[in-house]
């Protein structure tokens, strides 16, 4: 009996400690850790390119000092830029995230689990991104369309 309890306990422990997202077995597309890590690193680089002060802030501080103060145009621009980046990384699979709720939730859960990478901002890439960001932001400011 004790041996059975020990075996069940070990199995439960290993299952509980699994790093894989298992809540969405019917997801049509399951983004890989490698893809999510690449997305997080690139997005963090781009955010810190535009908002260098993010490098020293916790998420709560960043929310209070940066994200909560973004204009609607800035939010729209970040939505566009982050979606475009994800589409560049996963290609045609991006359609699954738009159309399949389980695939989208799988991505969100995996993103939340892996989002702890530090940015490594490349000055040349940053300059190019800033131009792109500013250009789209100007267009978003002039748009009276819904979010």
Spans of model-derived segments:
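N-terminal cationic leader/targeting segments used for protein routing and processing
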Residues: 4-5, 113
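Sec-dependent N-terminal signal peptides
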Residues: 5-14
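Polar/charged side chains located within well-ordered beta-strands of beta-rich proteins
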Residues: 9, 46-47, 143
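Hydrophobic alpha-helical membrane context
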Residues: 15-16, 135
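Bacterial signal peptide processing site
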Residues: 18-20
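Short N-proximal segments of mature Sec-exported proteins
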Residues: 24-93
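Compact alpha-helical subdomains of small soluble proteins
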Residues: 63-147
């Amino acid at each position: 009996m004790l041996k059975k309890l020990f075996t069940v306990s070990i199995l439960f422990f290993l299952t509980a400690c699994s790093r894989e997202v298992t809540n969405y077995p019917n997801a049509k597309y399951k983004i890989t850790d490698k893809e999510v890590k690449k997305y997080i690193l690139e997005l963090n680089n781009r955010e810190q390119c535009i908002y260098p002060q993010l490098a020293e802030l916790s998420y709560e501080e960043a929310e209070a000092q940066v994200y909560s103060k973004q204009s609607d145009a800035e939010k729209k621009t970040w939505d566009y830029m982050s979606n475009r980046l994800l589409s560049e990384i996963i290609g045609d699979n991006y359609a699954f995230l738009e159309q399949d709720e389980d695939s989208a939730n799988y991505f969100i859960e995996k993103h939340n689990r892996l989002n702890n990478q530090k940015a490594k901002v490349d000055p040349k890439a940053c300059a190019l991104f800033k131009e792109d960001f500013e250009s789209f932001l100007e267009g978003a400011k002039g748009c009276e369309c819904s979010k």
